[in-house]
């Protein structure tokens, strides 16, 4: 029984560390790429014309980035910005999804 709890604790610790690392990379890329200047700190936009991304589904965020990257979804600013996120879509999406948002 003791071994079970030790294994459970170790597994939980590793999972939390990996999640924190992914969120940390996602947050760093979100800021470095300039996403924060429009979509706001933690994905909470203060401009009613720019969507907040905090708390959105990971797969939805990734799909939107891919649509902007391919040009399937049109927005001059996002069509220029989204390609810079290539390779970091999942970490950015996981970071944004982990942020809580209240209207």
Model-derived features: positions:
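Axial heme c-ligation environment in periplasmic c-type cytochrome domains
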Residues: 46-54, 69-103
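Short pre-active-site segment immediately N-terminal to redox-active cysteine/selenocysteine motifs
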Residues: 31-34, 42, 57, 88
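The canonical Cys-X-X-Cys-His
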Residues: 34-41, 92, 96
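Sec-dependent signal peptide recognition
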Residues: 2-10
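Electrostatic cytochrome c docking/interface patches
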Residues: 13-31, 41-49, 67, 100-101
């Amino acid at each position: 029984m003791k071994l079970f709890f030790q294994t459970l604790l170790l597994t939980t610790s590793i999972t939390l560390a990996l999640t924190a690392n992914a969120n940390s990379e996602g947050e760093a890329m979100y800021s470095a790429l300039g996403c924060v200047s429009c979509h706001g700190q933690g994905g909470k936009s203060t401009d009613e014309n720019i969507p907040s991304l905090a708390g959105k589904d990971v797969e939805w965020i990734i799909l939107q980035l891919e649509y902007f990257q391919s040009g399937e979804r049109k927005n001059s600013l996002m069509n220029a910005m989204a390609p810079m996120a290539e390779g970091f879509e999942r970490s950015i999406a996981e970071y944004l999804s982990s942020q809580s948002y209240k209207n």
